[in-house]
């Protein structure tokens, strides 16, 4: 979804030499991961809670009376596609992402200069303040200001938390713990949907729904005070002794010299590039494939239409005549499918590769969008706003198929792949670019979807299906497989690609030539050593 956040990807060739018991996995790592992962709950809870409260009559009556009046009209006198079309209602949803995009322009610099832990602390305070304002909102302005503060908090958290998890995780389990952030987002969504279902009949239940967003913020706030800073951040900022002590604490052993040396070497390399230099490198011809692919994946992730579904699915079902409690229950079912499918991604991403999941997910999402459009186009023309329960159940099943496809493909991979193709030179700017573009298009979709549905009717689902076709072809023809690719070989991987090699021009050809020379030297060494595998030949 807007779901997720940047994932730091670091490849260490000596990781197999660290020799930690159980690969470095221990109870302390679990506590660190669970506490820091509450940053994902912040994001997920906000995504999940928004659509539910906008379908609650008390909320609409207080802040959006014109929409409330439309919902009370007889079913045969209202247009099911336009009942909730209102720019102010869409601003309530989308202002969150506009604020997150603004923060992302400088969040990378704050994370690098101040550290991951202080950034998480600031993010949790901002989110807590936003939750408080929303819970106590007396008018639309107060509501939107609260949403902006929530966006500031998530914008900072999405830049810091995944990086924190990655740098604390043992190398052997780094990929799995990185994906845990996306899992936390999906859990946050379903928790919010369950809260909405429970508060729908309460007096001012929407206040409780919005206010409970403060719970994960409090967890992250306490965790930010108690958890250690990451070894990488401490070492980058010149605190090597403290960095080694934290590393030993995380690994539950003093035998951390090899990993400590690797972190020091990586930190030394990364500090060679300021954030300004990182942005300059990203926009150079040599790294233009990373810029284009990162930006397109971030944009296309939102053009799947997932956030339109997650934000507005209760509104969608309510518009088609489903009872409010049933509409909210449908969101819980969709949220459960979202969580289950994310587990599929965690366990299959390193088995089937990134391209395989992208392609399968694209085909499945396309089918889901087209079938949804066809069913609504036929059935709404026949029944208006009183869809039969069997038809509503069929739409729910198709949406679940679509959401599952997203959750094991474009959801987590939309963040993972951009992180894997960033070199040391471009990492800071590249991941900021991913967040900025993602939040920008989340804002656009959030602000436009209800108006698009009113204007395009069932065709809005074909609009997103068309984009799914484009992104699937993009993956097939333009995206190299990044599974297991060391970060230092990423530019060469793009230089060998049929399209990106042309984009990189002379720089790309030079990289390929250097790689061929290196390989030729390795082969020559193996031949001279008397063995094809590079080991000394045995005496006969």
Curated annotation (Swiss-Prot):
* Keywords from the UniProt entry: Membrane, Sugar transport, Symport, Transmembrane, Transmembrane helix, Transport
Those parts of the protein on the Cytoplasmic side are 1-29, 112-124, 169-176, 229-296, 338-355, 418-435, 480-540
Note the SUPFAM superfamilies from the entry: MFS general substrate transporter
* Transmembrane portions of the chain: 30-50, 91-111, 125-135, 148-168, 177-197, 208-228, 297-317, 327-337, 356-376, 397-417, 436-456, 459-479
Localization recorded for this chain is: Membrane
Topological domains, Extracellular: 51-90, 136-147, 198-207, 318-326, 377-396, 457-458
Q: What is its main location?
A: membrane
Per the record, its GO cellular-component terms are: membrane
Write down the InterPro entries for this protein, in alphabetical order: MFS_dom, MFS_STP/MST-like_plant, MFS_sugar_transport-like, MFS_trans_sf, STP/PLT_plant, Sugar/inositol_transpt, Sugar_transporter_CS
The entry lists its GO molecular-function terms as: monosaccharide transmembrane transporter activity; symporter activity
Q: Keyword Transmembrane, does the record have it?
A: yes
Question: What membrane topology is given?
Answer: Multi-pass membrane protein
Keyword Transport recorded:
yes
Q: Could you tell me which PROSITE patterns the record lists for this protein?
A: MFS, SUGAR_TRANSPORT_1, SUGAR_TRANSPORT_2
Q: What does this protein do?
A: Active uptake of galactose.
Q: Which family does it belong to?
A: Belongs to the major facilitator superfamily. Sugar transporter (TC 2.A.1.1) family.
Protein name according to UniProt: H(+)/hexose cotransporter 2
Q: Which organism is it from?
A: Parachlorella kessleri
Name the gene. Answer: HUP2
């Amino acid at each position: 979804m807007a779901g997720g956040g940047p994932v730091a990807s670091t490849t260490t060739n000596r990781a197999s030499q660290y020799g930690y018991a159980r690969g470095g996995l221990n109870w302390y790592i679990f506590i660190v991961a669970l506490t820091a992962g509450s940053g994902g709950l912040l994001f997920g809870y906000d995504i999940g809670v928004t659509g539910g409260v906008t379908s609650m009559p008390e909320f609409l009556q207080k802040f959006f009376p014109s929409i409330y009046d439309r919902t009370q009209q007889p079913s045969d006198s209202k247009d099911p596609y336009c009942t909730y079309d209102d720019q102010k209602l869409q601003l309530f949803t989308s202002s969150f992402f506009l604020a997150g995009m603004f923060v992302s322009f400088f969040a990378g610099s704050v994370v690098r200069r101040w550290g991951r832990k202080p950034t998480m602390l600031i993010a949790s305070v901002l989110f807590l303040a936003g939750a408080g304002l929303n819970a106590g909102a007396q008018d639309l302005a107060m509501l939107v200001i609260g949403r902006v503060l929530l966006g500031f908090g998530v914008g900072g958290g999405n830049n810091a938390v995944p990086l924190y998890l990655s740098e604390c995780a043992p190398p052997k389990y780094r990929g799995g713990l990185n994906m845990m952030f996306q899992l936390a987002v999906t859990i946050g969504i379903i928790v919010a949907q369950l809260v909405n279902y429970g508060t729908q009949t309460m007096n001012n239940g929407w206040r409780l729904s919005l206010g409970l967003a403060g719970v994960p913020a409090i967890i992250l706030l306490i965790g930010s005070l108690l958890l250690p800073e990451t070894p990488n951040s401490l070492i980058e900022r010149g605190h090597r002794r403290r960095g080694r002590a934290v590393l030993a604490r995380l690994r539950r052993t003093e035998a951390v010299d090899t990993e400590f040396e690797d972190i020091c070497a990586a930190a030394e390399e990364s500090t060679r590039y300021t954030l300004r230099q990182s942005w300059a490198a990203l926009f150079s011809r040599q790294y233009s494939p990373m810029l284009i692919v990162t930006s397109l994946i971030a944009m296309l992730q939102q053009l799947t239409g997932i956030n339109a579904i997650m934000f507005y699915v209760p509104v969608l079902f309510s518009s088609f005549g489903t009872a409010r409690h049933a509409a909210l229950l449908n969101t819980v079912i969709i949220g459960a499918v979202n969580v289950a499918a994310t587990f599929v991604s965690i366990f299959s991403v390193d088995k089937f590769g990134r391209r395989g999941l992208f392609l399968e997910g694209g085909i499945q999402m396309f089918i889901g969008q087209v079938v949804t459009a066809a069913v609504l186009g036929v059935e709404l023309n026949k029944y208006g706003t009183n869809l039969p329960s069997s038809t509503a159940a069929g739409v729910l099943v198709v949406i679940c198929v679509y959401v599952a496809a997203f959750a094991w493909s474009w959801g987590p991979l939309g963040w993972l792949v951009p992180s894997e193709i960033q070199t040391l030179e471009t990492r800071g700017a590249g991941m900021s670019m991913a967040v900025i573009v993602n939040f920008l298009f989340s804002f656009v979709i959030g602000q436009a979807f209800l108006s698009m549905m009113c204007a395009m009717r069932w065709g809005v689902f074909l609009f997103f299906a068309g984009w799914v076709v484009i992104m699937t072809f993009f993956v097939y023809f333009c995206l190299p497989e990044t599974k297991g690719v060391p970060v230092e070989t990423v530019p060469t991987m793009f230089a060998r690609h049929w399209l990106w090699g042309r984009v990189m021009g002379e720089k790309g050809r030079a990289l390929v030539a250097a790689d061929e020379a290196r390989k030729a030297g390795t082969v020559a060494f193996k031949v001279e050593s008397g063995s094809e595998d590079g080991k000394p030949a045995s005496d006969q």
